[in-house]
């Protein structure tokens, strides 16, 4: 028993370090998703079409968000290991790389959404639904998208700074900036969606304006606070004196980071395609999935934060060259993540019958959403394992393996399964959703074998 405890569980200092990193991320993400949930409920009170339009656009912008996440994460692997070596110059190179790549991705997103926004939204409106509801959903979606585009550059800058701070083990400032932004978003949502205290009742437009304002505030807070404290953040000193990056550093980041950028972008596109496959079962499914994803995002922060803890802690240990400690730490982190998320799954299952009642929509949509939430809860422990395995592979720079493990599997297995079941069978959305989730068990087995073999154990900055 003692041997098992030592192998799979850490001591007090171990968990203190883990939760010093994970808890601020959980708090920030938790508050963010809680306010997003309230935002979603507020929009849902206007009507099903407005809720569906906003949901579709958020699914499209989710691809951009994960593209930025991939852009900063590729360089972030090096940031964590440079920090483990206390190499300030190296950290500066990664920040510049993140910013330049983020600008390019943002310009591309602007072009795609402005030129092809209506076409992208229409892709989700192919299922059953009246012509009137489809037109209304498209109208609200276009309104929301055009305003949300203004916030993309601010989101990108925030992610560049927040990711760098986290990779250096500093999670408090991003949390504080996130909380401030969330409170601003919540207050403006209430004022601008419903027109309270003399403000205009802008509905969907009000929700978009509130989000953009909150992102501007978050960017201002995190950038100013970081640069005003060069003692704790030495990488800011001379950071923009030049934007040059040594060619060998660029080459290493591109080699390791490109698969990660492609992975996050293709994975997000895969998730958007899954939603499109599900929507073939009718417009009511879009609404039910929106309700499901809203509450799921709140509970998914548990394994998302633990995954980031894996990437940061294991990455820093790999930077020191202690492979034995990295492997031992990673094993304990994976076990902790799965156990924590099992408890989270039970709580989500209990809440499933209650949450859909907050939406002003039909009983059929509420019932479908309740069952989808229960299915999602059932697979949270599996997702916790998958997330920890993915971040383990990524921490050691095995980004090509992570690419095949994550996005290639998504497109070749998940999307193909969803499309086949949606178009070639009469199965309900509940069974289709269940079987798609179940296919990830194969990915879990593959990931477990790769991590156990130790293919990820390497220092990539020496």
Where are these regions (language model features)?
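Short alpha-helical transmembrane segments in multi-pass integral membrane proteins
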Residues: 1-22, 79-151, 199-258, 314-379, ...
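N-terminal transmembrane alpha-helices
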Residues: 9-41, 45-46, 62-74, 78, ...
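Transmembrane helical elements of multi-pass membrane transporters/channels
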Residues: 20-39, 147, 181, 214-218, ...
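Generic alpha-helical transmembrane segments of integral inner-membrane proteins
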Residues: 26, 30, 34, 38, ...
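Helix-terminus/linker motif at the lipid-water interface of multi-pass membrane proteins
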Residues: 30, 34-52, 121-135, 193-202, ...
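Small-residue hotspots at the loop-to-helix junctions and early N-terminal turns
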Residues: 48-59, 141, 145, 208, ...
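Small-residue-rich hydrophobic transmembrane alpha-helices
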Residues: 51-111, 155-174, 275, 286-352, ...
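Short runs within selected transmembrane alpha-helices of multi-pass transporters and secretion channels
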Residues: 72, 148-166, 174-182, 207-223, ...
């Amino acid at each position: 028993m003692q041997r098992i405890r030592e192998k799979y569980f850490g001591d007090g200092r171990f968990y203190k370090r883990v939760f010093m990193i994970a808890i601020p991320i959980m708090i920030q993400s938790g508050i963010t998703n809680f306010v997003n949930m309230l935002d979603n409920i507020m929009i849902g009170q206007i009507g099903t079409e407005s809720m569906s339009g906003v949901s579709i656009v958020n699914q499209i912008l989710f691809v951009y968000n994960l593209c930025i996440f991939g852009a900063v994460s590729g360089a972030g692997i090096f940031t964590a290991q440079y920090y483990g070596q206390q190499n300030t110059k190296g950290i500066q190179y990664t920040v510049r790389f993140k910013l330049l790549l983020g600008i390019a991705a943002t310009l591309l997103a602007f072009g795609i959404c402005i030129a092809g926004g209506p076409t992208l939204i229409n892709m989700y409106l192919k299922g059953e639904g009246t012509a009137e509801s489809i037109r209304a959903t498209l109208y609200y979606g276009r309104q929301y998208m055009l305003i949300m585009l203004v916030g993309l550059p601010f989101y990108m800058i925030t992610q560049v700074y927040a990711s760098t701070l986290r990779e250096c083990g500093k999670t408090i400032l991003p949390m504080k900036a996130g909380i401030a932004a969330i409170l601003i978003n919540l207050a403006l949502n209430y004022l601008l969606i419903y027109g309270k205290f003399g403000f205009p009742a802008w509905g969907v437009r009000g929700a978009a304006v509130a989000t953009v304002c909150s992102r501007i505030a978050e960017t201002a807070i995190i950038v100013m606070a970081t640069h005003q404290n060069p003692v704790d953040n030495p990488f800011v000193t001379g950071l923009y004196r030049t934007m040059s990056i040594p060619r060998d550093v660029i080459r290493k980041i591109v080699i390791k980071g490109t698969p990660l950028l492609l992975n996050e972008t293709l994975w997000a596109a895969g998730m958007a395609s899954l939603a499109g496959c599900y929507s073939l079962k009718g417009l009511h499914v879009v609404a039910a999935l929106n309700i499901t994803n809203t509450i799921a995002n709140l509970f998914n922060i548990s394994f998302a934060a633990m995954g980031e803890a894996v990437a940061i802690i294991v990455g820093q240990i790999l930077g020191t060259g202690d492979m034995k400690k990295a492997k031992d730490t990673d094993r304990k982190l994976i076990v902790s993540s799965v156990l924590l998320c099992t408890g989270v799954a039970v709580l989500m299952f209990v809440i499933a019958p209650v949450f859909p009642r907050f939406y002003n929509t039909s009983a059929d949509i509420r019932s479908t959403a309740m069952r989808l939430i229960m299915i999602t809860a059932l697979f949270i422990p599996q997702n916790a394992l998958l997330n920890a395995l993915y971040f383990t592979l990524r921490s050691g720079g095995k980004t090509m393996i992570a690419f095949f493990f994550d996005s290639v599997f998504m497109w070749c297995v998940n999307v193909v399964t969803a499309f086949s079941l949606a178009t070639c069978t009469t199965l309900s959305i509940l069974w289709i959703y269940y079987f798609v989730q179940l296919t990830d068990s194969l990915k879990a087995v593959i990931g477990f074998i790769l991590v156990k073999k130790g293919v990820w154990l390497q220092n990539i900055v020496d």
